[in-house]
């Protein structure tokens, strides 16, 4: 599998474009907007879009998913059904944040452990609630790379201080679903630079091993 990222929307959200080098079939993760950039990349690389994937239903990540799938005939899959109320209110969210967005019904709601396929490639689905109830991440075992949306960032973690967020679930998603994939696994976050899970375990001031040990010690004092 090959992949690259295109920044979209004023939030500079990392829209990831993945493709099978044998069949040139492609998948796009989180087309939040600026579809012309995404379509130009696909055309430049001579790729055929088969699959549109969504990590969670916030407008900077999912706002353009329906339009891209309709324009290309690609399947639209994800997120987990826990985000159904957000999927149904994307247009309203978009108006609130001044980001163009359309509601949609996915061709498939995703569950933990599912596989999504394009060309000869497959990604494993990990249900990772915490930033939203239906948030999912995608993992390619062969490339040892994950696409984690807004759960984890380089030296930071996703926001949880809103109606659909939950800090405990966020911590469990990162520590039990992502970090257990292995220290060598690299990841593309929803915003900012790539990193590895091993680096974040050592250096992330919010969720790293030392940070978690301090937090647990403070609770015992």
Residue ranges and their predicted role:
Residues 6-8, 99-100, 105-107, 127-129:
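Short Gly/Pro-enriched turn/cap motifs at secondary-structure boundaries
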Residues 91-93, 115, 121-127, 132-221:
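Metallo-beta-lactamase
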Residues 18, 55, 128:
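Conserved S/T- and glycine-rich ATP-binding loop of Class I adenylate-forming
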Residues 23, 33-117, 121, 202-214:
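Active-site HxH/HxHxD metal-binding segment of metal-dependent hydrolases
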Residues 27-29, 51-53, 125-127:
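Short catalytic-loop micro-motif centered on adjacent basic/acidic residues
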Residues 29, 77-78, 148, 189:
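Hydrophobic residues in well-ordered beta-strands that form the structural core
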Residues 1-45, 137-149:
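Conserved beta-strand hairpin/beta-sheet module of binuclear metal-dependent hydrolase folds
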């Amino acid at each position: 599998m090959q992949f690259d990222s295109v920044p979209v929307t004023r939030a500079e959200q990392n829209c990831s474009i993945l493709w099978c080098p044998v069949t040139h079939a492609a998948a796009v993760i989180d087309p939040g907007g600026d579809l012309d950039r995404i379509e130009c990349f696909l055309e430049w690389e001579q790729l055929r879009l088969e699959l549109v994937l969504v990590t969670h239903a916030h407008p900077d990540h999912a706002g353009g998913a329906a339009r891209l799938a309709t324009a290309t005939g690609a399947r639209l899959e994800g997120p987990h059904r826990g985000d159904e109320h957000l999927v149904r209110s994307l247009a309203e969210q978009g108006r609130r944040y001044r980001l163009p967005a359309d509601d949609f019904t996915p061709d498939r709601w995703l569950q933990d452990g599912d596989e999504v396929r394009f060309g000869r490639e497959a990604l494993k689905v990990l249900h990772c609630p915490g930033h939203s109830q239906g948030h999912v991440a995608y993992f390619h075992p062969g490339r040892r790379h994950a696409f984690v949306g807004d759960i984890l960032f380089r030296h930071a973690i996703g926001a949880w201080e809103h109606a659909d967020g939950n800090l405990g679930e966020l911590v469990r998603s990162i520590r039990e679903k992502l970090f257990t994939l292995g220290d060598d696994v690299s990841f593309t976050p929803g915003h900012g630079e790539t990193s590895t899970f091993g680096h974040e375990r050592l250096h992330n001031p919010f969720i790293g091993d030392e940070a978690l040990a301090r937090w647990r010690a403070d609770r015992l004092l």
